[in-house]
């Protein structure tokens, strides 16, 4: 396949144009007065959302060079979402501003490598200052963080209650309700950090996850590599017409191929994951899962083998959600007495062990067994509203978790403005010289942009607001919802510092790559290439 090439300034300008198109699409959603974006779907109703990463994932541009820029900006949003779960629009706006200001300097003759170094040093100084300015979350601030992310006080209160009940490390899942009410239900469940063995198991392509309702659960201590050994069990599961969830040390070779083929053909809705943990801890964790789901672990030690067992060794659960990294089991069929006995056994082990590492791992297992799962059932009048609400609640859960981890700073873009003081005080920044020193100004101008757009979307002059906030004390800032300048933390306008730092670092990373790019190579469109070599 022939390629198209772009060089030097033309290459960088194409990347900038692509980043601009994506950033201009998402930045209208920034802040409490941000607008929505409507996404067309090939089938079903359109999606209405103000979630940056959801919008970014839908953007594909005609121009292949510009599309590279859009994909880079998409990477900023996706990475920020992976690390912090929110802040995707802020990250995209920062990336756009850093690229724009940086390219201006490069076009004027500055050395891209020096500009890159200056941006990296400046951003690290600002990120460190953000952490210094952060404070731990207290009381009602949990509800405030969630309410700001979800743009709903009602959802904020619901999430504060959920985290209050399951703890900051507890699992919160989001399901669709059959009513119009949104409610919190506490249920027994568990999450562990193993995802599906193959993306072919995915049932929801948009969210890249596999969801099994009312599923049978097979827990096998060893590897499954031969189809013959578990074919009888597979046939029995097929006759039951229920989905099958398999946990094993590994599923490989023809066994995995058979499961994938059955899944693709729609013969059997099946998902396989590797067992969590290692060695003796893996055996213990499998027993925990078995207790929770009413299953028996298939193991030679217990005199059980796959080719000789029936449906009686399988457990069940109301709902199992599997992503590429995690598995969440909700409402397992294990009896309350069995779970209580297992919890008592773990507590007894905890009192007997002297090893800090063992204690930590036992406490993790105890939390998973005893802590339960908070299920938020999202209700809405229409399917379009339901999807949009689910996006907002997912962002809010991630934001709240991030706030509980690293603390909070003043929201509304003000924290970035206050952290700019680090550029005048940090010795690593003040020691920069030449083109690297000019990059400090690039970061200084870029960090104003999130606040500028929050104010602009609310109908105010962004630059005037930013100038006024720069003169105020730390934690003072502009409340776009009320239009007042006030103590934002006291007013409940707060952001998780983890989200702000992740947005800043990811934006700087992509901007540095764009500024040091010299050549772009893309596929030549098929219609242009069709008659290549046949011209007479």
From Swiss-Prot:
Disulfide bonds: none annotated. GO terms for cellular component: cytoplasm. It is found in: Cytoplasm. ATP binds at residues 29-32, 86-90, 412, 495. Keywords: ATP-binding, Chaperone, Cytoplasm, Isomerase, Nucleotide-binding. Its main location: cytoplasm. It comes from the Bacteria. One of its GO terms (biological process) is protein refolding. Its EC number is 5.6.1.7. This is Chaperonin GroEL 2. It comes from Arthrobacter sp. (strain FB24). The lineage of its organism: Bacteria, Bacillati, Actinomycetota, Actinomycetes, Micrococcales.
